[in-house]
Amino acid sequence: MRGREDANARVLGSQWGDEGKGKLVDILAREYDVVARCQGGANAGHTIYDDDGKKYALHLVPSGILNENATCVVGNGVVVHLPGMFDEIDALLKAGVDARGRMMVSDRAHLLFDLHKEIDGLREAELSGNKIGTTKRGIGPAYASKATRNGVRLGDIRDADKFANALRTLAADAAARFDGFEYDVEAEIVRYREIASRIEPFIADTVEYVNDAHRNGKKILVEGANATMLDLDFGTYPFVTSSNPAIGGVSNGLGLAPRKFETIIGVAKAYTTRVGAGPYPTELFGDVADKLRELGYEYGTTTGRPRRIGWLDMVALNYANQINGFTHLNITKLDVLSEMDELKIGVAYELPNGKTTTAFPADIATLENVKVVYETLPGWKTDIANVRSWDDMPENAKKYILRCEELSGVECRYIGVGPGRDAMVIKP
């Protein structure tokens, strides 16, 4: 199937991640010349399927890699664990997908080392009962190294002595900070000397590349990682990721001006999920949560952890739209709701002081104590996994989508009804 996009586009998560961004990017990628990642790292898990139904779980490689005509770009805003990236590249090659010559990584991108993963675990242990619930992929510590200006960039790997000294400094800083820190820095230096020659063909000035592509009329698709409600500035801080998955991270992470994008697609599940700790107003428990978790197979691509489950939260979705300015939405996993007798949408919050609001609070304590005001809609009790057109959609399923449009003020252009590439209804 093909999408309806004819302009440079950004695909962004509007909830807490795992919305299904990778599938839409995979579908749209066939219409684009460049598919780019702009932030995050291997904490992002994007699952896509080819036309034969073969499954690919990607973490660093952009989801557009299955489009043989697209160049995939890993931008400067991404933190890159090179061994993990090559594991993905090798797995793709074994499956018949060759990334060589079609993928480039920014020379400005910061490297994530195993020491960052070690620090991540030690930091979580320190927090004890106040754990963030990270993926322990080292993302936060890698961005911390970048922010404190002692990080190592991919381009540094070209100078063996400079690279080795920078890594030794990182290790010494970590050893001084954490009593239990154990890391063989010299072995890591040797390991990366071997990696250096292999990564060299992938290293590029991606800022120049994407801007040159734009000047030459090539279409660019940006694949966001994580999601707005995990954004370092706009998410449920401190229960957030360490980058900016919201709109600002695109320009910062690629070096491409905001005005060069016309389309901003927000991806949202027809219900919600969250992995890790943090406030989650519409969270469900008991039989309904268990049923949705099993029907939607809600287990993390990166961690395998069971995801928390909740009803669609329109307060959060409208907040994400306010920040990102979505031109349209992709509502995913609508098929998962097919067995439900009735559905609920959170439309407002009752605050602890008794007032009702449709604004998303910044204060975590407030968020943890709101009462959600729900609107109830009838279910459709019909399997929609094989529906491929809007006209064939059950009336109550249409009503659910149309109500989402009314409450958000944004067109729901793409409607996911299953995991496969073709399981997407494009609303006329």
UniProtKB/Swiss-Prot annotation:
Annotated residues for binding of IMP: 18-21, 43-46, 135, 149, 226, 241, 305
GO BP: any one term: IMP metabolic process
Residues in coiled coil: none
This protein's record includes keyword Metal-binding: yes
PROSITE patterns, A to Z: ADENYLOSUCCIN_SYN_1, ADENYLOSUCCIN_SYN_2
Residues at the catalytic site: 18, 46
Residues reported in the UniProt entry to bind substrate: 301-307
Cofactor requirements of the protein: Mg(2+)
Pathway in which the depicted protein is active: Purine metabolism; AMP biosynthesis via de novo pathway; AMP from IMP: step 1/2
Reaction(s) catalysed (UniProt annotation): IMP + L-aspartate + GTP = N(6)-(1,2-dicarboxyethyl)-AMP + GDP + phosphate + 2 H(+)
Keywords of the record: Chloroplast, GTP-binding, Ligase, Magnesium, Metal-binding, Nucleotide-binding, Plastid, Purine biosynthesis
Main location: plastid
Annotated residues for binding of GTP: 17-23, 45-47, 307, 333-335, 416-418
Cofactor binding note of this UniProt entry: Binds 1 Mg(2+) ion per subunit.
InterPro entries: Adenylosuccin_syn_GTP-bd (IPR018220), Adenylosuccin_syn_Lys_AS (IPR033128), Adenylosuccinate_synth_dom1 (IPR042109), Adenylosuccinate_synth_dom2 (IPR042110), Adenylosuccinate_synth_dom3 (IPR042111), Adenylosuccinate_synthetase (IPR001114), P-loop_NTPase (IPR027417)
Enzyme Commission identifier(s): 6.3.4.4
One GO MF term attached to the UniProt entry: GTP binding
Compartmental location: Plastid, Chloroplast
Quaternary organization: Homodimer.
Further remarks about this protein from its record: This protein may be expected to contain an N-terminal transit peptide but none has been predicted.
Family that this chain belongs to: Belongs to the adenylosuccinate synthetase family.
Name of the featured protein: Adenylosuccinate synthetase, chloroplastic
UniProt source species: Ostreococcus lucimarinus (strain CCE9901)
Gene name of the encoded protein: PURA
